Amino acid sequence: MTRKKDETPAEKVEARLESFYREKVVPVMMERFQYSNVMMVPKLEKISINIGVGEAAAEPKLLETAMLELGQITGQKPQVRKSRKAISNFKLRENQAIGCRVTLRRKKMYEFLDRFVSLAVPRIRDFRGLSNTSFDGRGNYTAGIREQIIFPEIDIDKVPRICGMDISFVTSAATDEEAYVLLAELGMPFKKKNN
């Protein structure tokens, strides 16, 4: 058996939600949408998490803490996002650091989704379900989170400022209905649809 140099036996272990997708979600989706081939079943391609820190223009330390927190939540180093153009009303210059972003794929993506659905979302105050209208028409879903302290990785005593984030779930689904069923089957707690 040949193994890649950097690959450890722990990396071969599949994420819990990834095996759940293959064993449970794929058959449900094939039956519901009458796909002729397993490869036609939509899948989660990536999760993109973005934190916008507009106040970073005046106080750069806020961006550093946001990057540190995003790194703790995702287990991956965030990318700094810079402004594209100057806007005088916001005291913003071109190429000024105003946010950070992380894109998760494969195993880390499934592990994050598992933690998000089972640990973080239940900790949201007055939670009644995620909005089921935040689909973009192309099978992608974006959830806005108001507080980063819902994640267990964040120590509430060390948080200088509460900030929110946008979490985008990019799927290979052709329609919003397929994406809704896919994410709901993966455990996403949506509000009940009004028919």
Curated annotation (Swiss-Prot):
Pfam families noted in UniProt: Ribosomal_L5 (PF00281), Ribosomal_L5_C (PF00673)
TM ranges: none
Superkingdom of source: Bacteria
InterPro entries: Ribosomal_uL5, Ribosomal_uL5_bac-type, Ribosomal_uL5_C, Ribosomal_uL5_dom_sf, Ribosomal_uL5_N
GO MF annotation, one: rRNA binding
Keywords: Ribonucleoprotein, Ribosomal protein, RNA-binding, rRNA-binding, tRNA-binding
Phosphoprotein as UniProt keyword: no
SUPFAM superfamilies tied to this protein: RL5-like
GO cellular component annotations of the record: ribonucleoprotein complex; ribosome
One GO BP annotation of this record: translation
Family: Belongs to the universal ribosomal protein uL5 family.
Description of how the protein assembles with itself and partners: Part of the 50S ribosomal subunit; part of the 5S rRNA/L5/L18/L25 subcomplex. Contacts the 5S rRNA and the P site tRNA. Forms a bridge to the 30S subunit in the 70S ribosome.
Function summary: This is one of the proteins that bind and probably mediate the attachment of the 5S RNA into the large ribosomal subunit, where it forms part of the central protuberance. In the 70S ribosome it contacts protein S13 of the 30S subunit (bridge B1b), connecting the 2 subunits; this bridge is implicated in subunit movement. Contacts the P site tRNA; the 5S rRNA and some of its associated proteins might help stabilize positioning of ribosome-bound tRNAs.
NCBIfam families (UniProt xref): PRK00010.1
Name this protein carries in UniProt: Large ribosomal subunit protein uL5
Native organism taxonomy: Bacteria, Pseudomonadati, Chlorobiota, Chlorobiia, Chlorobiales
